[in-house]
Amino acid sequence: MAKFLLLLRSENTEKENRFYIQAIQRFGGEVVFISDTDSYDDVLHALDSVSGVLLPGGYNVGRLDYFLIDYVVSHQLKLLGICQGMQSMALWGSSHQLISIGNSSHHQEEGYVHSVILENSRLQDILGVHSFYVNSYHYQKVLDSYYFRVVGKSSDGVVEAIEDSNHSFQIGVQWHPERMLEY
């Protein structure tokens, strides 16, 4: 059974964290938890036992986000960034900042909101489609990504997916796939 490290953000509710936990377990994974208040030594110890990291959604780039991305990239672990986690991946190593979207079309509490169009990518290979509808909970966006390649955008040009083209699974998505399991 593969072990995946899940960063528990202190601003996330128990319900929000439960979605991530259930998704990992549903697909046969075991969850190793760290908190965004844990020491760097504790985080390094936890990273020794996992094959991948899930960077979840949240409201701000946390103090451990870039530390985890540094470790994952240098040790070639699997990485899935969701919502804020993807934004952290996109901003990693750059001086770029998050931009306010300015409308509510990307923040709806339920259902599928807009489509995402994928370029030639691993994510497209995994999903087996070029375009599909996603949920959307974000108020901010990134314009580009410094290290990871942009592979998906919404019809209005918002970056929705990024990946490391040189690694089999280092992917960030702006939507919440863990919540799509209930639709």
Question: Language-model segments: which ranges?
Answer:
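Active-site-proximal beta-strand elements of phosphoester/diester hydrolases
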Residues: Q170-W175
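A glycine-rich, often tryptophan-bearing local segment used as a flexible ligand/cofactor-contacting loop or short
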Residues: S94-L98
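N-terminal beta1-alpha1 cap of cysteine-dependent amidohydrolase-like domains
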Residues: M1-M86, A90-W92, G102-L127, S131-Y133, ...
